[in-house]
Every structure is written in structure tokens, then in C-alpha cells.
Amino acid sequence: MNLAVIFGGASYEHEISIVSAISLKKILPALEHFIFVDGNRDFYWIPASEMRSKHFADGIYKKNPKLFLRPGGFYAKGLWGEKRVPFDTALNLIHGGDGEDGKLASLLEFFRIPFIGPRIEASVMSFNKHLTKLYAKERGVKTLPYLLARKNEKREFGNEFPLIVKPLRLGSSIGVSIAKNRQELDYALDVAFEFDEAALLEPFMQGIKEYNLAGCKINGEYHFSIIEEPQKKEFLDFDKKYLDFSRTQKLLKADLSEASERLLKEAFIKLYDDSFEGSLIRCDFFVQNQEVFLNEINPIPGSLANYLFEDFPKILQSLAHNLPKERGIKIDYRYIHQIQKAKGK
């Protein structure tokens, strides 16, 4: 498959994206083209042979060709003119801001570059935890009750604990804390506000089952991963969730009844359908007393959750060949001519 992996970004999850891209290269050794977005949002063409963490941490990437966008692709300037990066489809692998919030999707759609990843509306909705709650409700998928806290507003949250506190627009469990009393809540909010102007508070459900399910729709048919039950102490913190995702070995399937598995897949379809076409996403669910609750939609999971799939390369290739088509618009200026004639100009 002729893909170009776009990774990095001006994001708190910048380094996670680098690790994700390096891990994906191990799974798909045929990948040749990588496009790195640094903290200044400059694009660099990175050959597969230079995909090492040191290359980015030490700033060596700045010696690579800098890229710019034109309709249809990424280009580098050379001695004999411009050279296009030779790929058919881009793969959005930027976690957090720039990749999951719709910025990169906007650029790729504007320049008519085919890509795997969430489209603009799906990105904006899934990146904001409050919008995700509203979307899930509209789709008939339950979520836990919640409160919103804003940085400069007075805080009145009652006395029901424990609570889990999350920055409103951030992933990878960065800035997430559990508060068991008012003092811990104040501290947790201060931590969350280091990363965002708003935070989402939910009841922390001790002992609730959590399951992760990844998938995509190709030619009208859903392709699901195995269902994972993450191993955790209290909650999936940054170290457990993302320093561990670079693993490449396959996981054992969660011990679930057929009925529970069906409920999870039905909820996934409700969330994916007519919103996430062209992307491979992972939905994280809670299950309690045979009730399914959405925890979060991860529109660009770490290393695209390859470790959850039996035949990840085949699924990715099929997805690349069955992307949503943009509706063409014909511009012929006939209305301008009519208006000018009516005005006598």
C-alpha cells in the first residue's frame, strides 16, 4: 500500500505520535514515506530508514526536505524544481491537537488529498468530551452523568465523591486525576486547567468493567477488532495507556458473553455510522449490569490499535481503497453574468 504517514503536530501528545509512527513502521515495514509535523507546524519528509526517536529528539529532522502543500499532495523544492512525495493516500497519525481536532483534516480536504482518518465534523465532535456526550445521546448510546467546570467560573460541585476529572479537549489520559474529597478536587481541577480552559467531571465507578473495541466500515461492512479488557489498578493513566501501546504482540480476547459482545458492537455502529467513514477508530466502553456506557471515542488510537486486529495490514489496505468521495462542485459563473446583465454592467 502506498501510504504517507503524517505524525507529530503542535500537541501535548506530540511525542506519543512519534512513538505511534515508529511502532506502525514495525508492523508495516513496506511503508516508505513519513511526513513529520514539528512544533512550528512545518512539514518534513522523513525516509523510513530515519524513523528513530533520536532523529526527532535531537532535531536531526531539520536536515530533511521541508514540504509544502499544493492541490493533490505534498511537495519539496529541489535543484531541478519541485518534487511531489509519491504516495496515494495519507494516514493521519497525529494524536491530540492538530490531528484529532480537525485541523489536519481541514488541510487535507482543502487540498484534495485522500486520507485515512476522521473528517472535520467527526474530529471536532470526538475531540471535545462534552460534544461527544451530546453526540452519543443523540445516537442512543448512554454515557455517565457529568459536570462541566471552566477555569474562571465559581466552582460548586456538591459533595459526591470520588470523581474523575479530565481536561475537556485532550487525550492519552494526560491531566486526568481522581478526586476523593474537596481538597483533591481543587487540585485535580488545577491540574486539568494546566492543559485546557475547561474540564469534565464524572463519577468514578469503582470496579466497573471497561472494554475497548476498534473497527471501521469498508464497502458497507464493519470490520471489528477483538474486544480488549484493559488491565488497570484504578484507571488507565498515561503510563499504562500510552507507554504500553507501542507493544506489537496480539492481545487475548476479553472474556465476554455473546450478548455483551453484541451490545458493544451495536453501540459502536451507532456511533460510527455516517460520521466516521474513512477512519479506523476505537471506542472505549463501560459495562455494568448488562448496560453499555460510552467512555470516549478515540478517532486516532495509538498505532491505530493494530495489536487488536487479526489482519491489520489487510484492513488498512482495504480502507485506503474505499475512502469517502468528496462531492464535486461545478463552478461556471453563470449567476455572476446574469447579475451583471441585470445591473447593466
Curated annotation (Swiss-Prot):
Reaction it catalyzes: 2 D-alanine + ATP = D-alanyl-D-alanine + ADP + phosphate + H(+)
ATP-grasp domain span: 133-340
Chain sites annotated for binding Mg(2+) 1: D284, E296
Principal location: cytoplasm
Residue numbers binding Mg(2+) 2: E296, N298
Localization of this protein: Cytoplasm
Entry's EC annotation: 6.3.2.4
Binding site for ATP: 162-211
Name of the protein described by the UniProt record: D-alanine--D-alanine ligase
Source organism: Wolinella succinogenes (strain ATCC 29543 / DSM 1740 / CCUG 13145 / JCM 31913 / LMG 7466 / NCTC 11488 / FDC 602W)
Organism lineage: Bacteria, Pseudomonadati, Campylobacterota, Epsilonproteobacteria, Campylobacterales
Gene that encodes it: ddl
